[in-house]
Structures are given as C-alpha cells and as structure tokens.
C-alpha cells in the first residue's frame, strides 16, 4: 500500500477529479495529482513493488508504473529521466526517476496516480495517511513515549 510521499516537497498544483483541461479548455477528469517542483527532483517509490513499465507513454511522457500486489498500482508521469527498468524490484523510498516536463505537460511536475484493479482512485488519502504517520513517528521519537500505530523507521 502506498505509504510515503512520492517527492520530499509536496506542492500540489492540480487535484484528483474534474478540472479544466489546460490543453483543451474543457472540463475533464484528472486521474491523479500534479505535484510541482524543479526538473531533476527525485521521485520515490511509495511502496515496495515490481516495475511494470518504465518507458515513454503518450500523454505521460517518460513514465514509470509500479505493481505493488493485491491489484494496487502507482503511476508516475512526465519524468525527465527514469532510474528503473521493467521487471526490477523496488522498495519503498527507492528513487525511481526524476521530475520533468515530458509528454503532455505545461511545466515541470510529477503526475502521480494510484489505481486499484485498474481503476484510478484519489491518491490524497494515501498521502494524508503518509503525512500523519510521519508526524506520529517523529513525535514519538522526540518524546519519551511508546510508538502507536506501527513501527518507527
């Protein structure tokens, strides 16, 4: 299950769901989140998995797809460079590529998707869970208390 943020600095520029398409100017469903940052910003695998595809895909540009098991998949688009290959095993936190503006893009950003059984789902809940877990673990490490809700990493 995706449980960390795909980039260190999370500056969301486009949410999941319906929005005005920047190329067509009409309302269209956006199947992921757009996270802005400088070209070359490291992109991290948000969970352990196997690379399904690492290639150019129309619209997405340089694209990485990670299969996490249990029909969960994450997709990373518009990369400037890919750091993985199809069939490679990756671990949560591994650098899988670098932010860019390839494909159908208006500027440097990461397009991040989570899919379950092939259907896009809102990645926001996964990112919120990652942030809350991080905050709990940091507070637990700083305070003289026991960690609750999972192992401290």
Regions found by a protein language model. Give the residues of each.
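Catalytic cores of peptidoglycan-degrading enzymes
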Residues: 4-144, 149
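Short, solvent-exposed mixed-charge patches
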Residues: 151-153
């Amino acid at each position: 299950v995706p449980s960390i943020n795909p980039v260190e600095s999370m500056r969301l520029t486009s949410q999941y769901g319906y929005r005005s398409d920047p190329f067509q100017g009409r309302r269209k469903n956006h199947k992921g989140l757009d996270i802005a940052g400088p070209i070359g910003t490291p992109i991290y695998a948000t969970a352990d998995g196997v690379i399904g595809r690492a290639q150019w895909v129309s619209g997405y540009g340089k694209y990485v797809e990670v299969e996490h098991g249990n029909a969960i998949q994450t997709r990373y688009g518009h990369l400037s460079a890919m750091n993985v290959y199809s069939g490679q095993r990756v671990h949560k936190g591994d650098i899988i590529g670098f932010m860019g503006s390839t494909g159908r893009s208006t500027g440097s950003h990461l397009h991040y998707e989570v899919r379950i059984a092939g259907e896009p789902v809102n990645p926001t809940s996964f990112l919120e869970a990652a942030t809350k877990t991080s905050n709990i673990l940091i507070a637990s490490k700083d305070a003289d208390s026991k960690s609750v809700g999972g192992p401290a990493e």
